[in-house]
Amino acid sequence: MYAVIKTGGKQYKVSEGDVLRVEKLAGEAGASVEFDQVLMVGEGDDVKVGAPTVEGGKVTAEVLGQGRARKIEIQKFKRRKQYRRFAGHRQQFTEVKITGISAG
């Protein structure tokens, strides 16, 4: 069984046992989270597509940990003017393991 969920402005295709990194969610390691914005649920030829979400669809997951991604370096400059600006950014993420999918 698989599902397409929406979290953090992105969509993910997940099945039970998958480990994925999503945008930061509240919760410590070991906590349980529920994704109720399920866009599609499928098993073999039986597919339910939501409009926009599947009624009663739910995906549960366990939080494995919080972290920060690799640093992205940003630079801007103007030629011949001795103007340079450097900045860096590390996006926060939450690593989750999918524990259950229910079609509702």
Swiss-Prot record:
What is the name of the protein in this document? Answer: Large ribosomal subunit protein bL21
Q: Which UniProt keywords apply?
A: Ribonucleoprotein, Ribosomal protein, RNA-binding, rRNA-binding
Which organism was this protein described from? Alkalilimnicola ehrlichii (strain ATCC BAA-1101 / DSM 17681 / MLHE-1)
Membrane as UniProt keyword: no
A Pfam short name: Ribosomal_L21p
Q: Keyword Nucleotide-binding: yes or no?
A: no
Name the job this protein performs. This protein binds to 23S rRNA in the presence of protein L20.
Question: What does UniProt give as the signal peptide span?
Answer: none
GO BP terms in the entry: translation
Q: Which GO terms describe its molecular function?
A: rRNA binding; structural constituent of ribosome
Listed under subunit, the entry gives:
Part of the 50S ribosomal subunit. Contacts protein L20.
Q: Which family does it belong to?
A: Belongs to the bacterial ribosomal protein bL21 family.
One GO cellular component from the entry?
cytoplasm
Under the heading PROSITE patterns, the entry gives:
RIBOSOMAL_L21 (PS01169)
